[in-house]
């Protein structure tokens, strides 16, 4: 497996750990096709609530994923009898460890910042996490539009007959 595939699968595992609503959105694609307005309404409500809670949920989800990803990788290797996906799980685990380290660094740096700046930054962080949650749910609920395959162009039934142009018939 190439490095590009390892990075792609690792990032997908990481994002599925941080945004578990992505998995639910992928499973409900067919319902969203049938009822798009209802799906959009539910999507906005869910992303508003979960996005505001992501300030607390992202550290919890990262810690949970950092603890369970090695076990999931082990179970996947036993189930498939192959170590092919271990690098992807290691990549996702490293991303979770990096996320935890950044969060710990931010918490310690917030101690030295004045309280008004902390509250403004928390408000901005909550709005960003709400937007990212909405984007992740929407991207997995409504996949990009793929036009149907085009049919080969068939000529009109009487293609060999001469059809005069408008300008030619005007001068007759």
UniProtKB/Swiss-Prot annotation:
It is a multi-pass membrane protein. Its main location: membrane. It is found in: Cell membrane. It comes from the Bacteria. Changing residue 96 to H: In strain: CWL029 and TW-183. Belongs to the chlamydial CPn_0442/CT_006/TC_0274 family. This is Uncharacterized protein CPn_0442/CP_0311/CPj0442/CpB0458. It comes from Chlamydia pneumoniae (Chlamydophila pneumoniae). The lineage of its organism: Bacteria, Pseudomonadati, Chlamydiota, Chlamydiia, Chlamydiales.
């Amino acid at each position: 497996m190439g490095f590009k595939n390892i990075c792609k699968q690792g990032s997908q595992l990481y994002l599925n750990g941080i945004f578990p609503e992505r998995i639910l959105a992928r499973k409900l694609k067919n319902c969203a096709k049938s009822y798009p307005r209802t799906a959009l309404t539910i999507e906005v409500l869910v992303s508003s609530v979960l996005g505001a809670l992501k300030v607390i949920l992202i550290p919890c989800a990262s810690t949970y994923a950092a603890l369970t990803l090695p076990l999931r990788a082990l179970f996947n290797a036993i189930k498939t009898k192959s170590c092919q996906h271990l690098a992807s799980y290691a990549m996702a685990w490293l991303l979770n460890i990096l996320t935890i380290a950044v969060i710990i660094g931010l918490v310690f740096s917030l101690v030295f910042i004045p309280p008004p700046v902390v509250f403004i930054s928390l408000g901005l962080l909550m709005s960003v996490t709400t937007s990212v949650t909405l984007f992740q749910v929407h991207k997995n609920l409504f996949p990009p539009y793929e036009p149907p395959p085009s049919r080969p162009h068939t000529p009109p039934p009487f293609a060999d007959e001469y059809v005069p142009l408008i300008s030619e018939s005007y001068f007759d």
